[in-house]
Every structure is written in C-alpha cells, then in structure tokens.
Amino acid sequence: MEKPATRKKKSQAPKEEAGAQKATVKGEKTSKGKKATKKPRKPRRPRKEPVLSPEDEAHIFDAFDASFKDDFEGVPVFVPFQRKKPYECGECGRIFKHKTDHIRHQRVHTGEKPFKCDQCGKTFRHSSDVTKHQRIHTGEKPFKCGECGKAFNCGSNLLKHQKTHTGEKPYGCEECGKSFAYSSCLIRHRKRHPRKKH
C-alpha cells in the first residue's frame, strides 16, 4: 500500500516577501515589480476633551471651598461628557433628558388623558396607568408577598405591605418621636398635635 503524497511546507521566504508587500505605500513598486494596493495608516487624532461653558466651570468649582479653588485657578478640569437635557417645560421650567418624557409631562398642564379603559371608560395620562387600572376589572394580582403569600395588583402596594413584615418605620414625627411605616399615617398623626402659635 502506497503512502499518500504529503505536501511540502512552504518556506518562510515567501511570507516575509508578502509582509514586505504590505508595508509598501500605495503606488510604489514591490520587490516583485507589482504596485502596492494597501493604503498607509493615518495617525490617530488626539481625543478631544469636552469644552466647558463658564457656567459649567463655575458649577464644578462651587463644589470646592474658596481656598481650594484659588489653588487651582486656571487649571483645566476634566469632567466626563454629560449629555445636555434640552427639553424644558414652558409652563413650569422642568427639564427633561428625553423628548418622550417631555411630551408625557405636558399632559399634566394640558389635562390631556388620551388613554381610555375599554371596560369603564375612565381615561388616563399614561398607557401604563391604564394597564394598572385594568387589573381592577380582571382581578389580576401579579405582585405576591414572599413572606405571607398575599397578592397585589400594584407593585407599590406590595412594597408598602412588606413593611409590615420588616417592621420598618421610616416616617418619624419631629414633635414626639413616634415612627410610622407610611407617610399617610404620619400626616394623620401630625394633625393630632396642637398647633404652635408663633
């Protein structure tokens, strides 16, 4: 039985020539007399630092105390690039990063409620509010407490409920020190304190 013919390995010389061809500039002839086709690499441009407005610089330096600021007067400060928030509400001056958030906010001032519940006709400013509302009609309660199993139609109601298990009472009365799990309970409690006359 004959052994199959094996290929001879190419010598290193042609590879070196190929490498030499790549290094030549377009239009110049290679060692074989052919024109080079690869363009030389352009040097990378230095990265531009963001240009800060005088207001931005003042805002940055306000964070330092006056003596520290004097030490660095005229020294450029690098601040990571932050996208401006170009959408400002004409009514209240509130600024938004995204156009869609600005449009949604405008409905607060116009009173527009373009989203309607199919079952009862109630209208809402946001589509997500309709989705939450429709759970009243369907009886869906997708938010379940891991401790006791009680279910809720709204995630915020589950968070409020979980405070009954943790004992968390973050809302404290400044007058008597009594604490409450819910802000509404604190507001109700404050009404029981006699008002101070100034």
From Swiss-Prot:
Tissue: Predominantly in the spermatocytes and spermatids of testes. It is also expressed in the fetus and embryonic stem cells at lower levels.
Molecular function terms, GO-annotated: sequence-specific double-stranded DNA binding; zinc ion binding
Record's compositionally biased regions (Basic residues): 1-12, 32-47
Chain positions of all zinc fingers (C2H2-type): 87-109, 115-137, 143-165, 171-193
One annotated Gene Ontology cellular component of this protein: nucleus
Gene3D superfamilies tied to this protein: Classic Zinc Finger
Pfam families: zf-C2H2 (PF00096), zf-C2H2_4 (PF13894)
UniProt KW keywords: Developmental protein, Differentiation, DNA-binding, Metal-binding, Nucleus, Repeat, Spermatogenesis, Transcription, Transcription regulation, Zinc, Zinc-finger
Function of the molecule: A putative DNA-binding regulatory protein associated with meiosis in spermatogenesis.
PANTHER family linked: KRUEPPEL-LIKE TRANSCRIPTION FACTOR (PTHR23235), ZINC FINGER PROTEIN 384 (PTHR23235:SF142)
Protein name: Zinc finger protein 41
